Structure formats: structure tokens, C-alpha cells
Amino acid sequence: ETAIHLKTGIGPLSAYCGATSAGCGAGAGITYLHGGRYNEIAHTVVNALAINSGMVCDGAKASCAAKIASAVEAGLLGMQMQMHDSEFVGGDGIVLKGVENTIRNVSKMAHDGMAETDREIIRLMIAPQEGAASC
């Protein structure tokens, strides 16, 4: 449910990497399995969003697997942080007081703020690239 809740505010198409939402969901689920209640789960989600919320989708190429690993790691780190009473708080970057406020901020950034990023990524992907197959 956490990943779906996050994705609802972002919308169906965004330059925002959907793996970030999935990583938050994984962290929330694992926190629950470790006996976490609402507050612990909420802090895990906020921590994970603070860690990894700026990742962009570039078309699900080979780098996507690494982005998924990064998102899951952010979820796990968010959980470990809250287990040790360490958390991001309102004023730390895009984090606001309360998980729902933070989710709204991330959704606004992903939906509205990344609109031009989305257009630029598409331009980069369809433009012929010199030496695209090599580094």
C-alpha cells in the first residue's frame, strides 16, 4: 500500500523513478515485520524519501536494476535509522513535519517539478548520440 500511496500523488508518467516508491514500500513492510507500528513505519518512509527522492527514470535501461537496488537500500537504511532513533525532520531538505506532508512535497516535486526533466530525458533518448555504445 505504501508504494501505491506514494505513486498516486506522482501520477502515471513522471521523470521520477518509480523504484523509489517501491523501496519505501519495502522498507515500510520490513519495519512492520519487525514489529513496527504506524510511527515507526512513517519514520522509515520519511527517511527513505529523504535519502533517495531525487532519482530520475531514464527509460528502464540497464541502469534500472542498480536504481532498484539503491531504492531498496534506502528503504532498509531508513528502517535502520528509525530503529536507532535517528530520523530526518521537517526542514531537512524536502522533508516536512509528518509523513503525509513529506509525501505531498515529494509528489509535487515529482509531478510538477520534474515536468521539464521528463521532456529533456525524452529529447536525450531520441536524439542520435555520437559514440552512444561506448564510454
List each language-model region with its residue ranges:
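Active-site nucleophile and cofactor-binding loops and adjacent substrate-binding regions
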Residues: 11-22, 67
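A beta-strand-loop signature enriched in Asp, Gly, Thr, and Trp
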Residues: 9-15, 40-44
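Functionally critical mobile loop/hinge segments
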Residues: 23, 32-135
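Glycine/charged-rich beta-loop-alpha catalytic/anionic-binding loops adjacent to active sites
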Residues: 2-12, 56-60
